[in-house]
Amino acid sequence: MGNASENFDIEDLMSYGDDLINLLNVKNGFDIISQSSEQFKALNFACHEDFNQIQGSIEDCKTKLYACKKKTEEAYSDIAAEDEIERLQKELDEEMEREFKLKDELRLVADELKDLNAQLSSIDEHKQSTKRKVRDDLRAEKKLSMYASVTNVIPDIDDPSKISGYMVDREKRLIEKFQFETNKMTAYETCNSIWSIINKQ
């Protein structure tokens, strides 16, 4: 079996050698070999050019792929940033709405406080007015008491359009009412009439 393989190789080698001799014996055989060599060199050069071009294309693709990857990462980063901005904007809107509601509540409380202060001021004024009225009434009462003790006359000051009052006789325990129409009497006549009533006591 080994001999058959060796014989086969030798036969192939001898056949290749015969073909080569025949090729060299041809008139233009050397030219064909030279032409084939030139074609081989040209093909080899073209292959190198194609290789270099493909290699450059691969590097260019790598560069573009890196740039695309970087842009993708930036895009994801921008998306994340946009999500964060949207979240912060939402929180800001919620805080602004909460602040607006608090301002409304504060305004209502301020209005209520203003009303309470106005009521308190009115109460204080009414209290002071009541105190003045009580004081004035007490003063008037004392004045009337003094008039009554001196003149035995208690004037009626509730109606300023007329002069009226009561004549008091403490000994007899009598009270007599008197009244003068100011539109029918002069001030002088009214004064004389009052003194006449007093002198009767």
From Swiss-Prot:
Record GO cellular component, one term: Ndc80 complex
GO biological process: cell division; meristem structural organization; positive regulation of cell division; regulation of chromosome segregation
Tissues in which the protein is found: Highly expressed in actively dividing tissues, such as shoot apical meristem (SAM), root apical meristem (RAM), vasculature, newly emerging leaves and inflorescence shoots.
Annotated knockout phenotype: Embryonic lethality due to division arrest before the globular stage.
Location within or outside the cell: Chromosome, Centromere
InterPro entries registered for this protein in UniProt: SPC24-like (IPR044951)
Keywords, sorted A to Z: Cell cycle, Cell division, Centromere, Chromosome, Coiled coil, Mitosis
Assembly and binders: Component of the NDC80 complex, which consists of NDC80, NUF2, SPC24 and SPC25.
Family (UniProt): Belongs to the SPC24 family.
Cited function: Acts as a component of the essential kinetochore-associated NDC80 complex, which is required for chromosome segregation and spindle checkpoint activity to ensure proper cell division. Required for the maintenance of plant architecture.
Protein's name in the database: Kinetochore protein SPC24 homolog
Protein's organism: Arabidopsis thaliana
